[in-house]
Amino acid sequence: GPSMGFHGMR
């Protein structure tokens, strides 16, 4: 999810 910043950005 977006909370990861770099992984959830997709």
From Swiss-Prot:
Tissues showing expression: Brain.
A GO cellular-component term linked to this record: extracellular region
In-chain residues carrying the UniProt-annotated modification Arginine amide: 10
Keywords from the UniProt entry: Amidation, Neuropeptide, Secreted
Classification via InterPro entries: Lem_TRP
GO biological process: neuropeptide signaling pathway
Name by which UniProt lists this protein: Tachykinin-related peptide 8
Species per Swiss-Prot/TrEMBL record: Rhyparobia maderae
Taxonomic lineage: Eukaryota, Metazoa, Ecdysozoa, Arthropoda, Hexapoda
